[in-house]
Regions:
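Structural/interface elements that position substrates and couple domains in central-metabolism enzymes
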Residues: 1-277
Length: 277
């Protein structure tokens, strides 16, 4: 942007300040983190970095770290790519453990007892407008070097497909065993727990896939943080649990932990750690 401005108005160079200051905020806790988190201040020159730091210093209580704008932009991409890689490791473990007959939640809990191990929790993929998007900027710009980053994206995208196949197999098995189609509760559409943000949500992608590929199945779609959706009728989480033969946990919203951990008349598929037994 600076290059475009100064190409058209070269006399403005040195008279206006431009800086890139990536946000580090958690959905659902934005204001607190906007104020308290450390910030990276990337100016196109020292004067720009100083001016931006002075502005952010008026309301940010965290430390301000000045650098150049290119490093600041890469810092944002690297932060989210790092999270994506770590989540991919957890998601890959969950698929390995399913084949090996090992409880992945117990395994991760035990492995994390090691003082230098901190494995994240697996889910049904990665969503949101940052972690699921930013790695592509690095892998597309540096395709020969960004091997791990690109592979992590593939793993996290595949995890959603894996969940779809697991759910479809459970539905087909129920039909063969009971000679009828099941009611299926799809629990959660948001990309992470306890928010209403559906952007790039793997849970949403899974729900849409199942809804489209199994039109004769009754799906009870649950998202306690929204009141309506243009594509689905939203069902209360308790009603969906009670009425469904198969319960599929896609997002670990706090309300779901109030439901029974076991039910003799239901098959429960837990892709996000609501039930960790």
């Amino acid at each position: 942007m600076a290059e475009l401005i100064f190409a058209e108005r070269p006399e403005l160079k040195g008279r206006i300040h431009i800086a890139y200051c990536p946000e580090r905020v958690l959905p659902g806790n934005v204001i607190f983190e906007l104020v308290n988190n450390d910030r990276v201040i990337g100016g196109i020159d020292d004067a720009s970095a100083d001016a931006a730091a002075e502005f952010y210093g008026k309301f940010v209580t965290g430390q301000l770290h000045k650098t150049n704008c290119r490093t600041a932009e890469m810092c944002k991409l690297v932060e989210n790519s790092s999270r994506d890689v770590q989540i991919a490791f957890a998601n890959e473990l969950s698929m390995i453990c399913e084949k090996a007959g090992i409880n992945v939640w117990e395994l991760i809990s035990l492995a994390n007892k090691h003082p230098r191990v901190n494995i994240l929790q697996p889910g049904c993929g990665v969503g949101g407008h940052c972690i699921a998007v930013d790695p592509y900027f690095i892998s597309s710009a540096f395709p020969n070097e960004a091997k791990i980053i690109a592979q992590a994206r593939s793993i996290n995208n595949y995890k959603s497909e894996w969940c779809v196949e697991k759910a479809k197999n459970a539905i087909l098995s129920f039909q063969l065993k009971n000679c009828k189609k099941p009611q299926v509760a799809l629990m959660g559409l948001a990309f992470k727990p306890n928010i209403d943000d559906l952007r790039e949500s793997p849970a949403m992608k899974i729900a849409k896939r199942l809804f489209a590929e199994m039109p004769d199945v009754k799906f009870n779609i649950v998202e306690p943080n929204i009141s309506s959706h243009p594509d689905f009728d939203i069902v209360d989480f308790q009603t969906a649990f009670e009425q469904s033969d198969i319960v599929v946990y896609l997002t670990a919203h706090k309300q779901f932990f109030m439901l029974p951990q076991e039910a003799n008349d239901k098959l429960i598929l837990d892709f996000c750690g609501v039930i960790k037994k």
